[in-house]
């Protein structure tokens, strides 16, 4: 398949309903290379943090977020960058959504006994430098990933959590020992997808009173789309990602091993390490006129930390 002349892989899901079959199509851009922050859809600061985490020789790097937050796309972008290096990369996926030259990709097949966990154990016998596990779905896969990380491998995987600090709690809830979670975790990239304002009908105005409370005093003008034929009169066209990057340091390792709460880890990351939260990153996009205050409200509703 192709989108606007660019190659793309197509994934189709069809289910039967009482009104007939319902189909959902997922397009994955196969022509994107992670060579700049713009390509990756993130700030220079967060991009630099991701590259620093990937330079570490071992540890687990999680990409987290809800379903449909672009985790797979980000994971493939990272793999493509790593594939340019002289390293042995093995990936276990379900399904393989994009073929990447230079990477040994395995397709999960539960009927044949190939699961994420068994594939991961098999990959460890292939002398890998980097292992990608498409999704950490169960405690056994998590524990094997932890063992791989502490024995000198860089492990990339995804988890369903709301923010970076919440990933630590998720690991412990899935059965990881605190001291092993502390020693194995290298970094976390939490992300969401937000809609971009249509460039053809973009306009601006001053925020109203409610929007000022949401945005804070730093943003004096906001942009939005009035709606046009090109965007289907929605005011939006395309999507981009917002990110939250947590690079694990010695203090965070000690906090994890000591059983600190999610809020304490988040507070340290934000106030001491200067981590920009998902909300902070989205405020940046609102200020730049890339997305709207409406998207900020949608993202932060019910997710603000105390």
Language-model features, listed with the residues they occupy:
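Short, flexible helix-loop junctions that flank or precede catalytic/ligand sites
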Residues: 1-306
């Amino acid at each position: 398949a192709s989108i606007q002349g660019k190659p793309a892989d197509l994934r189709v899901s069809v289910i039967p309903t009482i009104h007939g079959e319902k189909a959902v199509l997922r397009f994955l851009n196969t022509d994107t290379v992670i060579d700049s922050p713009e390509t990756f859809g993130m700030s220079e600061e967060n991009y630099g943090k991701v590259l620093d985490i990937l330079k570490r020789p071992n540890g687990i790097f999680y990409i987290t977020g809800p379903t449909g937050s672009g985790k797979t796309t980000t994971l493939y972008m990272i793999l493509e960058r790593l594939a340019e290096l002289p390293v042995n990369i093995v990936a276990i996926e379900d399904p393989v959504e994009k073929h990447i030259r230079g990477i040994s990709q395995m397709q999960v097949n539960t009927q044949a006994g190939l699961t994420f966990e068994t594939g991961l154990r098999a990959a460890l016998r292939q002398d890998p430098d980097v292992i990608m596990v498409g999704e950490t779905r169960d405690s056994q896969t998590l524990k094997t990933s932890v063992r791989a990380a502490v024995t000198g491998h860089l492990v990339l995987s995804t988890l369903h959590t709301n923010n970076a600090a919440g990933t630590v709690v998720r690991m412990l809830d899935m059965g990881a020992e605190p001291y092993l979670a502390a020693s194995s975790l290298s970094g976390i990239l939490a992300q969401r997808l937000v809609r971009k304002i249509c460039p053809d009908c973009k306009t601006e105005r001053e925020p109203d009173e409610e929007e000022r409370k949401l945005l804070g005093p730093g943003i004096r003008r906001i942009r939005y789309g009035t709606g046009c034929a090109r965007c289907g009169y929605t005011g939006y066209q395309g999507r981009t990602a917002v990110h939250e990057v947590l690079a694990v340091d010695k203090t965070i390792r000690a906090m994890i091993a000591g059983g600190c709460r999610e809020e304490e880890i988040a507070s340290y990351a934000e106030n001491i390490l200067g981590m920009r939260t998902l909300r902070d990153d989205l405020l940046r996009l609102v200020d730049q006129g890339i997305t709207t205050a409406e998207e900020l409200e949608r993202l932060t509703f019910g997710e603000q930390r105390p």
